[in-house]
């Protein structure tokens, strides 16, 4: 607002003093989680920030840069949106349990829960089903709360007990319960029927003429489902529909469902995990479809990382998860904005 006093820079001693307890909590959580992974026999890895492809999801946007080779020629590179591609290459190399506190980057993201640069905690277990990674998430979140001494997470008037047994809820069950939509009836042969979901969503969300099945799904999820999740305790939302599989494998006994889950606390998404897809040709097909949609919507598309696709074909069966570390620290420390828990928040913070 005009006339509002500008916020002091983060290095202002008075502002830093206010933020310091949250930053100390960040250190405590980091140490506690490294201890958990050490107990479990994980190896901590550090993978490259600069990538040939930052990821191939339609709605994720990555900062782009150039590198100059010794001969003066230039090559495009991207700041990664996730360490996933690099970590899976390490699984193909023979690593079996790895984790990384990864600095990642996303354009077009800023707010109470979003930063353009943030920390993603990712870990992978070779030879493990995805419910093993779900169980890891529950322990990791409890360890974070234990490290700071907080008994209850709180955000925007919602609370969650990080030590309670989590709620397990299928995506189809959530759509039926919170939106009155029979989601699986709108999927056939692994493909979403746009007309069927649009009809089911009438009166529940606004559907635009150019909305895809995935767009309508996301609107219902955001407006009707997510606000109800993680209330009183954690919610694990699992069995995502196959059109939203991303890098997850589809269930062998039901092609409408993918081995994908998300974890919520206080309505906040904390983690997104997969039973990992190891079919390189299927992964290529999904990437190409996503990039075609990205080109249509945003006028840009990212290249495919052919080295990654080769590694997918060589990967063992595995499961993995990406957890928003800054969000976890925010809840575990009692902070109300994500910038309170990062040491050097963006200079444009207001």
What are these regions (language model features)?
Residues 2-132, 140-142, 226, 330:
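Class II aminoacyl-tRNA synthetase-like tRNA-binding/catalytic domains
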Residues 280-350:
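Active-site pocket scaffolds in enzymes
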Residues 59, 75, 95, 114-120, ...:
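A generic structural signal for well-ordered coil/turn residues at beta-strand boundaries
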Residues 143-268, 289-315:
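Metal-assisted phosphate- and nucleotidyl-transfer catalytic regions
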Residues 23-27, 31, 39, 43-44, ...:
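Conserved structured core elements
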């Amino acid at each position: 607002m005009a006339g509002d006093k500008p916020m002091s820079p983060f290095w202002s001693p008075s502002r830093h003093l206010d933020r310091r307890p949250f930053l100390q909590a960040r250190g405590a959580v980091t140490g506690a989680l490294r201890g958990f992974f050490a107990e479990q026999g994980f190896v901590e890895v550090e993978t490259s920030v600069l990538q040939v492809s930052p990821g191939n999801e339609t709605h994720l946007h990555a900062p782009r840069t150039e590198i100059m080779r010794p001969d003066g020629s230039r090559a495009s590179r991207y700041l990664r949106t996730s360490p996933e591609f690099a970590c899976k290459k390490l699984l193909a190399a023979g690593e079996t349990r790895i984790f990384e506190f990864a600095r990642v980057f996303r354009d077009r993201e800023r707010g109470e829960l979003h930063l353009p640069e943030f920390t993603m905690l990712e870990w992978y277990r070779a030879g493990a089903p995805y419910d093993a990674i779900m169980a890891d998430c529950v322990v990791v979140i409890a360890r974070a709360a234990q490290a700071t001494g907080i008994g209850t997470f709180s955000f925007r008037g919602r609370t969650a007990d990080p030590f309670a047994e989590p709620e397990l809820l299928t995506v189809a069950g959530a759509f039926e319960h919170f939106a009155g939509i029979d989601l699986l009836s709108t999927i056939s042969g692994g493909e979403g029927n746009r007309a069927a979901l649009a009809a089911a969503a009438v009166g529940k969300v606004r559907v635009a003429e150019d909305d895809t099945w995935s767009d309508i799904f996301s609107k219902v999820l955001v407006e009707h489902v997510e606000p109800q999740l993680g209330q009183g305790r954690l919610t694990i939302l699992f069995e995502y529909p196959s059109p939203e599989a991303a890098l997850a494998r589809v269930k062998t006994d039901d092609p409408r469902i993918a081995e994908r889950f998300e974890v919520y606390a206080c309505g906040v998404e904390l983690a997104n995990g997969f039973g990992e897809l190891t079919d390189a040709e299927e992964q290529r097909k999904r990437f190409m479809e996503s990039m075609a949609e990205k080109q249509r919507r945003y006028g840009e598309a990212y290249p495919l990382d052919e080295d990654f696709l080769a590694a997918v074909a060589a990967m063992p069966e595995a499961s993995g998860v990406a957890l928003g570390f800054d969000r976890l620290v925010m809840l575990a420390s009692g902070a109300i904005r994500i910038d309170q828990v990062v040491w050097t928040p963006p200079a444009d913070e207001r």
